[in-house]
């Protein structure tokens, strides 16, 4: 039944109000989960922290699906009436325009309409155009900073800073932690030859929690200079202490990396805090900052906005990404923009014993799992519209012939039905060919550490070929090829059986039974392709990775529910306090 003229405005107002209320319920529950973090830290409940992280990630899609179902029931046959949805959008604007972080609500509205209509590209009459969604354009004033004046002593200054950390757990040795922070700051300032004294310290009041650590985030301010400041806190069985102090841009960047789990930080108004973080890390995209503080959907919206704003002036074309051709994914990039696009191929070679649904599940696993600073955050996008002229001819041919299930054409446009977007890195095999011996050795050492770090968080990369790892600007080795990724706990790590006869020894194929989940670590070294210089470097530091015993030991710890810490800092990057 068609709506009457008097019914339509009333229904539009009701639907807009329901959408606003749904977001408020989502946001309230999101913040309630986030506010568990201090208690998890105080009680050293690390398993609880991990559960909270997954629960919070799943919350957004849950509320979108529930709201769509409710609105579909309310609207009935008019659920796809675009004129009605245009009216709902206008009513929605009136309801949210005075609210803080209004752009978050617009993003939520877009999620609803895109679910209803399966929008390809942009439909301005029923959604908010991403290019116009700037969450930092109208940031409401918000008193979220604490300022501590330097009254002549760094020790007194940081005594006041640490006293501002409210925690039910006792300090293990408060005075020692104060001395450590003051000493580290003084030492770093000396390396900068900075003679002008720090006049104050500015700290974000809400604490940043990430699994087993709490972080106090702010900056040290002097006359005409400032330094970023992050103080990492650890809660041991004997109490809380300062674990490390970070004042270097590179170290702060690693902490707020696209490879780490999201922070739990309860910000009443997000935009103002994002502006401050952007000042601390001016080279980090706003999209990554939104994502790493846990606002993943807004981070995704920002990435879309950054991309399409860049395309308005870009002169280059999309081309295949550097590196070897993928067997499961087609990977391409825009050289002038620092991301790659990954599309699932229509067909996989016989040696890949997987189907498309398996690949989707692997990426979903990574999205919800502790990435340990070693897995790139892959954002899933659907129904992206690009002018076909932006694609290199060879790439366009490959997409048409090998990814027809993920792309289609509409007039002069190419529609990408499904893809993942990730930060671009230099493939490790290419990096090792391009750098000198010292840099290559450091990369090989970090490659081995990456395998360890992933194992500690119950992730086995599966395919350890160097081409499946990348190197970031901070020279961190990151894994980014997920089609063979699995849980360490699901594998059976075995020693190679000894040959029982000369005939077995001479066979070209495997003569013993191998189950799907069998892994033989002794064979890893054959596939890595290290030269005669780098092989001993790897074996000296990480030789135990080639033993089934080491992997079974990790499995035992996982089954015992041990939380093995993989921190965004360490002796090789920043000094860590004595915190045994």
What are these regions (language model features)?
Residues 341, 350, 460-515:
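Catalytic activation segment of kinase domains across protein kinase-like and atypical kinase folds
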Residues 187-434, 439-442, 446, 456:
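Conserved ATP-binding subdomain of kinase catalytic cores across diverse folds
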Residues 453-459:
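Protein kinase catalytic-loop region centered on the HRD/HxD motif
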Residues 2-251:
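Noncatalytic N-terminal accessory/assembly modules of large enzymes
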Residues 506-575:
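C-terminal region signature
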Residues 364-381, 494-529:
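Active-site-adjacent segment of 2-oxoglutarate/Fe(II) JmjC oxygenases
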């Amino acid at each position: 039944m068609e709506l009457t003229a008097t019914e339509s405005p009333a229904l539009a107002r009701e639907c807009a109000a329901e959408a606003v209320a749904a977001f408020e319920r989502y946001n309230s529950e999101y913040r309630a989960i986030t506010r568990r973090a201090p208690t998890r830290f105080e009680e050293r409940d690390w398993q609880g922290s991990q559960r909270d992280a997954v629960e919070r990630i799943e919350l957004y899609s849950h509320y979108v699906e529930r709201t769509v179902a409710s609105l579909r029931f309310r609207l009935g046959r008019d659920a796809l009436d675009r004129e009605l949805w245009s009216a709902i959008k206008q009513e929605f604007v009136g309801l949210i325009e005075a609210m803080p972080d209004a752009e978050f609500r617009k993003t939520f509205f877009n999620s609803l309409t895109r679910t209803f209509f399966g929008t390809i590209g942009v439909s301005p009459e029923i959604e908010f155009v991403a290019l116009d969604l700037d969450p930092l354009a109208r940031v409401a004033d918000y008193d979220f900073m604490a300022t501590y004046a330097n009254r002549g002593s760094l020790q007194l200054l940081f005594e006041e800073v640490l006293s501002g950390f409210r925690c039910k757990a006792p300090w293990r040795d408060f005075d020692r932690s104060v001395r450590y922070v003051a000493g580290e700051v003084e030492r770093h300032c000396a390396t900068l030859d900075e003679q002008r004294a720090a006049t104050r310290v500015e700290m974000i009041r809400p604490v940043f929690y990430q699994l087993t650590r709490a972080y106090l985030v702010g900056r040290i301010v002097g006359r005409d200079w400032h330094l970023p400041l992050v103080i990492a806190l650890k809660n041991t069985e004997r109490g809380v202490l300062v674990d490390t102090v970070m004042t270097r841009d590179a170290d702060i960047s690693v902490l707020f990396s696209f490879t780490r789990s999201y922070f739990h930080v309860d910000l009443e108004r997000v935009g103002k805090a994002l502006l401050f973080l952007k000042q601390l890390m001016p080279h980090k995209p706003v999209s990554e900052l939104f994502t790493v503080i846990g606002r993943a959907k807004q981070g995704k919206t920002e990435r879309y906005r950054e991309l399409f704003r860049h395309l308005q002036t870009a002169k280059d074309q999309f081309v295949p990404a550097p590196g070897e051709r993928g067997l499961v994914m087609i990977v391409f990039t825009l050289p002038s923009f620092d991301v790659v696009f990954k599309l699932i191929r229509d067909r996989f070679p016989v040696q890949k014993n997987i189907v498309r649904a398996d690949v989707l599940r692997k990426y979903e696993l990574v999205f919800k799992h502790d990435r340990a600073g070693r897995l790139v955050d892959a954002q899933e996008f659907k129904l992206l519209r690009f002018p076909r002229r932006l694609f290199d001819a060879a790439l366009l041919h490959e997409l048409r012939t090998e990814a027809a299930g993920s792309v289609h054409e509409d007039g002069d446009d190419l529609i990408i039905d499904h893809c993942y977007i990730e930060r671009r890195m230099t493939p490790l095999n290419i990096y090792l060919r391009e750098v000198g011996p010292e840099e290559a050795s450091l990369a090989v050492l970090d490659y081995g550490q990456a395998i360890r770090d992933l194992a500690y968080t119950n992730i086995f990369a599966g395919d350890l070929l160097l081409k499946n790892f990348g190197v970031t600007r901070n020279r961190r080795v990151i894994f980014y090829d997920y089609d063979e990724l699995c849980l360490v706990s699901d594998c059976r790590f075995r020693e190679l059986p000894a040959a029982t006869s000369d005939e077995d020894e001479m066979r070209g194929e495997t003569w013993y039974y191998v189950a799907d989940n069998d892994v033989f670590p002794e064979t890893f070294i054959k596939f890595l392709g290290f030269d005669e210089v780098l092989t001993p470097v790897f074996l000296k530091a990480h030789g135990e990775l080639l033993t089934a015993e080491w992997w079974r030991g990790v499995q035992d710890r996982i089954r015992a529910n041990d939380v093995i810490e993989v921190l965004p800092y360490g002796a090789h990057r920043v000094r860590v306090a004595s915190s045994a």
